[in-house]
């Protein structure tokens, strides 16, 4: 009996170490950033079972077999659609400003199409204005409405948008709504999904959270885009979820969420439509390519307007493109660089690009919320402040609520606005969208918004920062070590 017990014990120990060795080898063999690999190895060797389970659940990018097959199957038809779009040469910009040219060339080479011109843009900073404009556009819709959001929170003006969307569906408008399962959990537990489906709206719960499949698909891979397309002519995107700030997370202690949205008219709506169609097919298996370009885009031709490039990320889209776009924007700056983000946990490359810009004389400012709804990210962000301040970067801490805007402005001419946070999750994992806009007029509008944010912020004093308590420094370094996983 003792011999059997000893044998079982040795086999258990051997299996334990083989499991750790196998996962370690898997981490080392995967192409990933060194800090990320080191963080995972530390977790696994400090808390082996917890670390192994966590790694198998969220350590690798698993879209899931069915979705991965759909992603592969959709590309031949999508590529043909893009080739047809290229034939509409009148909508594509032939040249860009000197500051925007490197970024637009990168996007053209990685995504296969150039930036589109002839768009009209309106920058919107008040949630009421956004929802009122959206309700008007929905009421005037004639053909189709497509929406995707990370969060749809019932209550306030969000309910008015829902009512107008159902009214549109009842009068024959083809309405599709895709919402992230985790972000919109309150919506899917409410009566709204059934009410909408009964009205004729196609409602899809994207990337459903299912603990039974935790090792088959990465559960923290989320649909983080915020997009609206109406009649393939009007489009919205930005940082705002479908929530009324007066009803959203009022008990979080961070104040109302402050967002930015762009309302657009022009061929950019069709460019965004192909992104939506890819997301829809990956999630449902149904193909809904936008109308043929030669029919749909011709009415949009305009002699003037903004030049825009869409940058999409996520499984099935060009890998690392948004990260590359941010690096290119930072290295293109000659006069000033202003970045706004609620969550700041940059890659080493992005941190280096930001600091280098400041060290070569560029006026670099980063605007962050003083209070954050994520304690982990809040502390991890602070770990980068010393290096940024030493390089000459100005850090503004916004005090007027949770600043949720994601924006970058380079030399007053190149603007980036969208859904991308400056953290690892947005840069490497989630489905995201960013608009690159080459236009001085829009840049002036964005600069005015950022100036307003700065007026409601406190500039971080480098001397006072160096005098902060020791326990804060220890906490910052602890969270910094795990920042590649946040």
Curated annotation (Swiss-Prot):
Q: Which residues form the PLD phosphodiesterase domain?
A: 219-246, 399-426
Q: How does activity depend on pH?
A: Optimum pH is 7.0.
Which species does the entry assign this protein to? Escherichia coli (strain K12)
Q: Which family does it belong to?
A: Belongs to the phospholipase D family. Cardiolipin synthase subfamily. ClsA sub-subfamily.
Gene Ontology CC annotations of this record: cell pole; membrane; plasma membrane
User: Null phenotype?
Assistant: Mutants have increased sensitivity to novobiocin. Triple deletion of clsA, clsB and clsC results in a complete lack of cardiolipin, regardless of growth phase or growth conditions.
Keywords annotated in UniProt: Cell inner membrane, Cell membrane, Lipid biosynthesis, Lipid metabolism, Membrane, Phospholipid biosynthesis, Phospholipid metabolism, Repeat, Transferase, Transmembrane, Transmembrane helix
Reactions performed catalytically: 2 a 1,2-diacyl-sn-glycero-3-phospho-(1'-sn-glycerol) = a cardiolipin + glycerol
Q: What does this protein do?
A: Catalyzes the reversible phosphatidyl group transfer from one phosphatidylglycerol molecule to another to form cardiolipin (CL) (diphosphatidylglycerol) and glycerol.
Name the enzyme's class.
transferase
Its record classes its membrane topology as:
Multi-pass membrane protein
**What further fact does the record state?**
All three cardiolipin synthases (ClsA, ClsB and ClsC) contribute to CL synthesis in stationary phase. Only ClsA contributes to synthesis during logarithmic growth phase.
Q: Which GO terms describe its biological process?
A: cardiolipin biosynthetic process
The GO terms this record gives for MF are: cardiolipin synthase activity
Q: What is this protein called?
A: Cardiolipin synthase A
Q: What is its EC number?
A: 2.7.8.-
Q: Which residues cross the membrane?
A: 3-23, 38-58
Q: What is the superkingdom listed in this entry's lineage?
A: Bacteria
Where in the cell is the protein located? Cell inner membrane
Q: Name one Pfam family in it.
A: PLDc_2
User: What are the catalytic residues?
Assistant: 224, 226, 231, 404, 406, 411
- What does its PTM field state? Seems to be post-translationally processed from a 53-55 kDa form to a 45-46 kDa form.
